[in-house]
Amino acid sequence: MFKSFFPNPRLFFISVVAYAAVCSFIWYGFNEQIGGFLGFDLSSSAPVIGLGHFLTDSFLLFYIYYFACTGLFALVWFRVANHPWQWWSILGSAFILFSTYFSVQVSVAINNWRRPFFDLVQDALKNSAPQSSAEAKIEVPAETVTSISNQLFDLIIIFAEIAFLAIFVYVVTRFFVSHFIFRWRTAMNDYYTAQWEQVRNIEGASQRIQEDTMRFAEIMEGLGVSIVDAVMTLFAFLPVLWALSEYVSELPLVGVIAHPLFVASLVWSVFGTGLLAIVGIKLPGLEFKNQRVEAAFRKELVYGEDDVERAQPPTLKELFANVRKNYFRLYFNYMYFNVARMLYLQADNIFVYILLIPTIAAGAITFGILQQILTAFSQVSNSFQYLVNSWTTIVQLLSVYKRLSSFEAAIKHEPLPAIDQLAT
């Protein structure tokens, strides 16, 4: 799966993690010194509203730093372990990381836009709203109406500019990822078909090379991008949520704690991930077994097309009974998994509002800041809840991975897993 596309996968991914850690440490520890050396001014911390968010000195320095680090890493691997797919696997992966991070920064730019826009909405409504139903509506001067209208239209135009950029980045990223994943599938297909004599005796070998590599590619296309997006969202929005925590002084039941929004999102997400991992622990094995009983039933039918002695009704009845039994077990396990998952997700919809009740009641934040907090908390929580949101897909990927692992074992002349050993 990985050897066909990545050079020396085990060492490669270890080096990716280690190199990323070193580069991140240098960036967060010495970016001001690096920026000063290159002539960039990183002293301004005020958020820029609009497309200028992506052209600040901080961003320009990041672009230079990222591509320099990526180029150095790729150059070393091109020299150390030349691989036919290295341009796609190394530089392609780096491009996906960058485009995903840029897409997340588009969300940050929109979140920065929320404060002035919704604060302006709040001010406009406050200017004209009567204090009680008995009072007449307050007449707002025409000059004020014109001024606020122009400001709102200006902010809407800024939002449209950011939105068009978001659409462009999304389309480019998805287009590239589709090609990236198909190249990966091509590499797997070439690798497995070249070893056909060694894997042909594994149950459902043809299905595994055709269907399972296809399913692996399809799942990785969605799951891979989502996990990268989750990690990049954390990098982008954790500082935002950390900064917004200064507007929230205390939490219900807990009281005053440092950085309450950050702590609450972390605890709530870990709880949800742990809950779903526990209730869904049996699902990968059941999905894998489901593929096996379906393959056995299909294989007998295929044999019956050429051999009148095969695919007899009693045999087919027994094989389909296995299919039915496994599906019913799968349905039962998914039932209580979905109960736990939906309970958690419904509670998640109002969790942040519960946290903010003391702050809202005290009038400690404006409507614009509230919108920023809701967005940042949602982004961070959803990233921490990656397993919660993707568990069903992860289960499907694990079942495909188990099936393709049989090919890896056969190619390496290792004993097959007991579940895959066929009587000869």
Regions found by a protein language model. Name each.
Residues V145-I157, E161, T213-V263, D348, ...:
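Hydrophobic alpha-helical transmembrane segments of ABC transporter permease domains
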Residues R10-Y19, F54-L75, H83-V106, S128-I181, ...:
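Transmembrane-helix motif of ABC transporter permease domains
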Residues R183-I202, I281-N322, S381-V388, L397-F407:
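Short cytosolic helices in intracellular loops of multi-pass membrane proteins
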Residues V22-G39, A74-R79, V106-P130, L165-A166, ...:
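Juxtamembrane "helix exit" motif at the C-terminal ends of alpha-helical transmembrane segments
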Residues L42, V48, Q210, R310, ...:
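Primarily ABC-family ATPase nucleotide-binding module
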Residues W242-V270, N333-Y401:
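Helix-loop-helix
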Residues F30-G39, F78-S89, I110-R115, V171-T186, ...:
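Juxtamembrane/interface segments at transmembrane-helix termini
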Residues R215, K289-K299, Y303-F351, T393-Q396, ...:
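An intracellular "coupling" helix at the cytosolic face of ABC transporter transmembrane type-1 domains
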